Amino acid sequence: MAGTKPGDLGGIKVGQYIVIDGIACKVMDYAHSKPGKHGGAKVRLVAVGIFEPVKKEHVGPASSRIDIPIIDKRKGQVLALMGDNVQLMDMESYETLEIPMPDDVEGIESGVEVEYFEAMDRYKITRVISK
């Protein structure tokens, strides 16, 4: 899977990012339990998708591996608003991107500087930096 690295399921904490069923998610709840004398510890995670508003759950042994998405946080400038999309220029590479307009970020207009991130070849605007 491109854009991911392996990690220990037992080492995951609330607020970290993981991949469940090919979807990059943020961990919202973590439960660690040891079932008994002869059983291995189990981990139960509840996570919410970064790009889709889906709730995912994963249960597995604490010693197992799970994919962790490589998230690249960057700054960009909004060039134009085009319906449901935002045309954005990366402030480091000057590359032009077309990203879906987020529902939860306010103040996006032409000329403002925003923070966005890339994970698994998808992009999302996270906040407005300056107006």
Curated annotation (Swiss-Prot):
Keywords: Cytoplasm, Hypusine, Initiation factor, Protein biosynthesis. One of its GO terms (cellular component) is cytoplasm. SMART domains: eIF-5a. The modification Hypusine is found at residue 37. The keyword Protein transport does not apply. InterPro entries: IF5A-like, IF5A-like_N, NA-bd_OB-fold, Rib_uL2_dom2, Trans_elong_IF5A_hypusine_site, Transl_elong_IF5A_arc, Transl_elong_IF5A_C, Translation_prot_SH3-like_sf. One of its GO terms (biological process) is positive regulation of translational elongation. Its main location: cytoplasm. The keyword Cytoplasm applies. One of its GO terms (molecular function) is translation elongation factor activity. It is found in: Cytoplasm. Functions by promoting the formation of the first peptide bond. Belongs to the eIF-5A family. This is Translation initiation factor 5A. The lineage of its organism: Archaea, Methanobacteriati, Methanobacteriota, Methanomada group, Methanococci.
